[in-house]
Amino acid sequence: MAMLGVTAPTATAQVGAAKKIVDAAKEQGIVGETIDGYLALVSGSASAEIEAAMNEINIRRKSVYTSLARETGTSPENVAGVSGEKLVAKARRGEKVRLSNGEWQTVK
């Protein structure tokens, strides 16, 4: 099944101030991309601002995944998984990503 356009809608799901906050948190290793298509805290907790920004982006991503699933006749989880694979693959050097085994890895 081809999932065309998964990356572009995901990008639109993370606009504005929330993206800037999360990008900074990614650079610091506080937040990372997961293989299931959502952002997560790498360990422990983060500031309320970081958690709110991460949650905002995850809510927007879920909405995009749900819309794409309706359009393509698949599940939101399937769309999220395909998107997650792409987001993990695009992570920048030094950022953390959570793989399918649940372990965090630093991108080299």
Where are these regions (language model features)?
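Bacterial N-terminal signal peptides
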Residues: 1-5
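Sec/Tat signal peptide C-region and signal peptidase I cleavage site
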Residues: 6-13
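A generic structural signal for short
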Residues: 10, 53-54
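Short, well-ordered alpha-helical segments
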Residues: 54-69
